[in-house]
Regions:
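Transmembrane beta-strands of outer-membrane beta-barrel pores
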Residues: 2-3, 17, 28-32, 85-89, ...
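Transmembrane beta-barrel wall of Gram-negative outer-membrane proteins
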Residues: 3-36, 48-94, 116-132
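Membrane-embedded beta-strand positions of outer-membrane beta-barrel proteins
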Residues: 24-26, 81-83, 140-142, 197-199, ...
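Outer-membrane beta-barrel translocator domains and adjoining extracellular loop/strand segments
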Residues: 35-44, 92-101, 105-107, 150-159, ...
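Extracellular loop and loop/strand-boundary signature of outer-membrane beta-barrel proteins
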Residues: 48-55, 107-114, 123, 164-171, ...
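Face-selective signature of the C-terminal outer-membrane beta-barrel domain
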Residues: 66, 70-88, 112-276, 296, ...
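Outer membrane beta-barrel strand-and-loop segments of large Gram-negative receptors
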Residues: 178-182, 336, 340, 346, ...
Length: 401
């Protein structure tokens, strides 16, 4: 839009020393964005309400540095290690013009926003694999990562004489960490059959904070809130942690040259705790089976049927107060500490037909899903004058298609 040009590039170096293979890389990717938008709203009787014109400029360049190591310990064992560090600061400036279409003459209010943003993350991971003489395989892996995000949104009313008055201070910060370790052992059973069993343990933590300041005659302005009056926000400062353990067993069976069957049984045990403005601990457990059958009816026609229980992982950001920068009508979004995992039974039938001379493939999918504890937006308004919504469990439902 403004013909802005920014440089970017990447460089990598790879090599081998004995049994060690390595790759180092660095990437600088410009993500500058200049966006101009117009939004017109109407009332319930279809009368024009207002028009909002907004110019948003984001100055951002992503810097990524990675390392990959692969070492062959012997003909039967190997180890790998990966590391990543990334910086994605995204300072943003906003200029907004709001025209009241109900007023005569029409009046336009001007707002300016400064939103410095700091974002960075890192991740390390690795795995070890051992193959026995008989073809059995043992594998263990680990992953550890951390994501840091912080932003301070300050909004100003701009008057006709060029003077300004701050009317919003919103400081947001979050740190998400995750640690996963998984081990498995795969062995043959009978001809055409093998079994894999193991377990996974994961720890996920979110530290979240939100500070809101508004101009108000009721209260004392604070420098920590941009010179505005601190406002009470429900669930603004919280730490959410989940400890999850998943033992599993997977059986693969090649019945014949045309049919295969995969069966999985997973047991999920988790504890979710929240501390800070809200203190609560809950335990959950699920048994998740899965069956997947494949049949090559002809070389051109493949059929597949599956049935499984799926448990969706919760988004920790739904537990705590947050902000939608694209919604100017709602400064903060409520969190919901009572969320439960959404889960569903998933039944699918697939058919793939390969057209003659390999000119294409025709696919068909029939499905039936039984959802439990579906998550969607619910009303959590404390009063008719303070309308609020949050993600919550709305009940059960079926999906057919």
């Amino acid at each position: 839009l403004d013909h802005n040009t920014q440089p970017g590039g990447s460089v990598s170096y790879s090599g081998q020393t004995g049994g060690l293979n390595y790759v180092l890389s660095a990437v600088a990717e410009p993500r500058y964005d200049h966006n101009v938008s117009k939004e017109t709203s109407i009332l319930a009787d279809f009368a024009l309400n207002d028009e909002v014109r907004e110019e948003r400029i984001r100055e951002q360049t992503s810097y990524d540095f990675s390392l990959n190591l692969d070492y062959e310990l012997s003909l039967k064992s190997s180890v790998r290690f990966n590391a990543l560090y990334s910086e994605n600061d995204n300072p943003t400036d906003v200029l907004r013009y709001t025209t009241d279409l109900r007023a005569t003459p029409r009046a336009t209010a001007i707002e300016r926003e400064e939103i410095p943003g700091d974002r960075n993350n890192w991740e390390i991971g690795g795995d070890y694999e051992y193959l026995s003489e008989g073809g059995d395989r043992f594998k263990v892996l680990f992953i550890s990562n951390r994501n840091n995000s912080a932003s301070t949104r300050e909004r100003y009313d701009v008057f006709a004489d060029g003077s300004e008055s701050k009317d919003l201070f919103l400081d947001l910060g979050s740190v998400t960490t995750e640690r996963i370790v998984r081990g498995s052992y795969t062995m043959g059973l009978f001809e055409g059959q093998d079994i894999e069993f193991g377990a996974e343990r994961a720890q996920t933590t979110l530290d979240s904070s939100l500070a809101l300041g508004l101009p108000s005659s009721a209260g004392t302005p604070s420098a920590d809130f941009g010179g505005l009056v601190p406002q009470a926000v429900s669930n603004a400062n919280s730490t959410v942690e989940e400890i999850r353990i998943e033992p599993f067993i997977i059986h693969n069976w090649i019945i014949n040259s045309r049919m295969t069957l995969e069966s999985t049984l997973l047991y999920e045990l988790s504890e979710i705790s929240q501390s800070g403005d809200v203190n609560r601990t809950r335990d959950f457990d699920f048994v998740n089976p899965k069956v997947d059958f494949r049949y090559n009816l002809t070389p051109q026609l493949q059929l597949r049927g599956s049935a499984e229980k799926v448990v969706r992982q919760l988004r920790f950001s739904d537990f705590v107060a947050s902000n939608d920068p694209q919604d100017n009508d709602s400064i903060t979004l409520y969190g919901n500490e009572n969320l439960r995992q959404e889960w569903f039974w998933k039944y699918d039938f697939y058919a793939d037909y390969r057209l003659p001379n390999d000119i294409g493939v025709v696919n068909m999918n029939l499905f039936y899903h039984q959802h439990k504890d579906r998550i969607a937006r619910i009303d959590v308004s404390p009063s008719e004058d303070n309308l609020q919504s949050a993600n919550g469990n709305i009940g059960d439902g079926d999906v057919v298609g």
